[in-house]
């Protein structure tokens, strides 16, 4: 009898929760239409996987890519609409949030073609892989529009959990298992530190969770200059540091890059940076409005350490993926300059512009690494020697992406860094910009070292891997080369036509 009553209560409670969720979606669903498209794509993937056999694999890629493209289209149609706060203040829609959502969707759209051949060669489970990618994308999109502390905590956890599962997707690879364990432990620690900082912010503001209400609460309680806010700032900055992976919070990055499947690394290397940057701009700029000098100082220290340590350690690496891991640490130092400058002097516009170029440069580089790794089975930098003699297209594509990452003119990376450093200089960050310029020159050295290996034609320097190099007979080879070509073009052409990109980026204000 007791069990029967408890069962009825459980059914009633579940029904109430379902009806409340349905009511919220009915009246607020139009505000998250791009996210709803991804949810529909996830459900469709599951249904097809349950009702079909493995011969329908092309449908999985088609549904995933189509849902991402339609979601991007929905975002573009919503561009320049008035800012809207929905879901009882938990979610905000404006141009600034939408540009980050667009970048995350763009990353995922380009990463899926990179994974096709790798998944077929390694015989990984395709459905679960795509589900994790789409769910991580969904978490990143909700993070970009999050307007309260609870959503800001839950959304990145959704992204992080999928990232842990993706990094350990090749279960029989010991390096992948080690990378996943380190990633999981560091991610769990960072989340606990972040939520502890949120608790200080919550208490100091008088129990407010919405970002703007926290500011009002701090004014009402006269706590905006209290030690509690300083403690909250330190904990939140440390928690954000593990998400952004600047030095000295970069310990997990090289191991995860080296041990995870290469398409997963390509996905995480860009989407995690975009999502974490969106989180940093909102959580630091709004609740810590009265502590701007303090968090500027903290971020300046992180930027300097990242630019110096990241580029110095990248020189000594022998693995291509570890080199790109340390390179990404240096790159995030440049992005932090834009976060520090903020709305003044087009800081956010320069950060968004550089991040757009970084996506194309980084994904183009990883596309080349995926192709080379599948055809040779090696990741060592020295094994790339003489690649130009066997595959000129792949060698030239990799060289262009590396040169753009280094910031050589007239490629997109040069103009992105130029605009970013110029905005930093106008804001008075002379020392920070000087460090950025010096470390950019330093990064060109190790990029050119790889390009020299690619272009060498002497037989004694060509490794057996390149000497026995063979193109893959798989049809899916076309998709990864198409994605690589798009990224290479995007790393080159935007340098010539910067004005439209800058105009769009300058429209993205709170």
From Swiss-Prot:
Example of a GO MF term: quinone binding
Primary localization class, coarse: plastid
Catalytic activity as recorded in UniProt: a plastoquinone + NADH + (n+1) H(+)(in) = a plastoquinol + NAD(+) + n H(+)(out); a plastoquinone + NADPH + (n+1) H(+)(in) = a plastoquinol + NADP(+) + n H(+)(out)
Mode of membrane association: Multi-pass membrane protein
EC number(s) on file: 7.1.1.-
Enzyme class: translocase
Family as reported in the entry's similarity comment: Belongs to the complex I subunit 2 family.
Quaternary structure annotation from Swiss-Prot or TrEMBL: NDH is composed of at least 16 different subunits, 5 of which are encoded in the nucleus.
Cross-referenced NCBIfam families: NDH_I_N (TIGR01770), PRK02504.1 (NF002701)
Protein name: NAD(P)H-quinone oxidoreductase subunit 2 A, chloroplastic
Source organism of this protein record: Sorghum bicolor (Sorghum)
């Amino acid at each position: 009898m007791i069990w029967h009553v408890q069962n009825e209560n459980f059914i009633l409670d579940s029904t109430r929760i379902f009806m409340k969720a349905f009511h919220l979606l009915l009246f607020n669903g139009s505000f998250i239409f791009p996210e709803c498209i991804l949810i529909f794509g996830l459900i469709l993937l599951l249904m097809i996987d349950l009702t079909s056999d493995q011969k329908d694999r092309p449908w999985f890629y088609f549904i995933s890519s189509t849902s991402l493209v339609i979601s991007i289209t929905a975002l573009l149609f919503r561009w320049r609409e008035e800012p809207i706060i929905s879901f009882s203040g938990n979610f905000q829609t404006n141009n600034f949030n939408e540009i980050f959502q667009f970048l995350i969707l763009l990353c995922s759209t380009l990463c899926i073609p990179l994974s096709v051949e790798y998944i077929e060669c390694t015989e990984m489970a395709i459905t679960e892989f795509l589900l994790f990618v789409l769910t991580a994308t969904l978490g990143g999109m909700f993070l970009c529009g999050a307007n309260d502390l609870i959503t800001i905590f839950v959304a990145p956890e959704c992204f992080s959990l999928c990232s842990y599962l993706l990094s350990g997707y090749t279960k029989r690879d010991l390096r992948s298992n080690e990378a996943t364990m380190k990633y999981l432990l560091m991610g769990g620690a960072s989340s606990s530190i972040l939520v502890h900082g949120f608790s200080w912010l919550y208490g100091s503001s008088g129990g407010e969770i919405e970002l703007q209400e926290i500011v009002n609460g701090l004014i009402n309680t006269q706590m905006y200059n209290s030690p509690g806010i300083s403690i909250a700032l330190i904990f939140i900055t440390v928690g954000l540091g593990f998400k952004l992976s600047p030095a000295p919070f970069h310990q997990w990055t090289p191991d995860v890059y080296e041990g995870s499947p290469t398409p997963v690394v390509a996905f995480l290397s860009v989407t995690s940076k975009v999502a974490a940057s969106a989180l940093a701009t909102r959580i630091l700029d709004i609740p810590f409005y009265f502590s701007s000098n303090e968090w500027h100082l903290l971020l300046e220290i992180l930027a300097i350490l990242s630019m110096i340590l990241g580029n110095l350690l990248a020189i000594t690496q022998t693995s291509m993926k570890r080199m790109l891991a340390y390179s990404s640490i240096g790159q995030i130092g440049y992005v932090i300059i834009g976060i520090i400058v903020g709305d003044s002097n087009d800081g956010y516009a320069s950060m968004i512009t550089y991040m757009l170029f970084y996506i194309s440069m980084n994904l183009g580089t990883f596309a080349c690494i995926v192709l080379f790794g599948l055809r040779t089975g090696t990741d060592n930098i020295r094994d790339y020697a003489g690649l130009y003699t066997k595959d000129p297209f792949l060698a030239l594509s990799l060289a262009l992406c590396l040169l753009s990452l280094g910031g050589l003119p007239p490629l997109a990376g040069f103009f992105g860094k130029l605009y970013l450093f110029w905005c930093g200089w106008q804001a008075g960050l002379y020392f920070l910009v000087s460090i950025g310029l010096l470390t950019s020159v330093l990064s060109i050295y190790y990029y050119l070292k790889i390009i020299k290996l690619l272009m060498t034609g002497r037989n004694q320097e060509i490794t057996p891997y390149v000497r026995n190099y063979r193109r893959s007979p798989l049809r899916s080879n076309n998709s990864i080369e198409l994605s690589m070509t798009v990224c290479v073009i995007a790393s080159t052409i935007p340098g010539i036509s910067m004005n439209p990109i800058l105009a769009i980026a300058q429209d993205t204000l709170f």
